[in-house]
Amino acid sequence: MSDIWDDEEVRETPSEITRVKRDHSQAGYLAGVTKAKDESLQEGFNAGYPIGGQLGLSIGRIFGYLQGKGLVEEEKQARKELSSTRIFDRQYWTTDAAPTYEGVHPLVKQWENKIDVMKRE
């Protein structure tokens, strides 16, 4: 057995070199994927938060108006038509989660129009 301070050249076997390369490659890949996911997640949150906030506020106003007026059947209908399943239907969003509509979500706009009519009656 040689001393670690000897000037002998340390030789790794080809299998050790392959293993070290693979381990470093995997570690680098995982670090890259993790960083990309973190950045994408934050970007998606930053882009989606204002849209989601506005949707929630608008839908909440609709529900609040209907509840405040005691319009139980209309509120049930609004809850059905403004459910998250319908609001986030593929027809309203691109594959990148951007809205396909301009301005107000079409389902929200329909209910805002209905409420405007109710207010005039």
Swiss-Prot record:
Where found in the cell?
A: Cytoplasm; Nucleus
Keyword Nucleus assigned to the entry: answer is: yes
Query: What keyword terms does UniProt attach to this protein?
Result: Cytoplasm, Nucleus
Q: What is its main location?
A: cytoplasm
Record bears the keyword Nucleus:
yes
What InterPro entries does the record tag this protein with? Essential_protein_Yae1_N, Yae1-like
A GO CC annotation recorded here is: nucleus
**Residues covered by region (deca-GX3 motif):** 28-68
Cite the record's note on assembly: May form a complex with LTO1.
Q: What does this protein do?
A: The complex LTO1:YAE1 may function as a target specific adapter that probably recruits apo-RPLI1 to the cytosolic iron-sulfur protein assembly (CIA) complex machinery. May be required for biogenesis of the large ribosomal subunit and initiation of translation.
Q: Which family does it belong to?
A: Belongs to the YAE1 family.
Q: What is this protein called?
A: Protein YAE1
According to its UniProt entry, this protein's organism is Yarrowia lipolytica (strain CLIB 122 / E 150)
Record gene name: YAE1
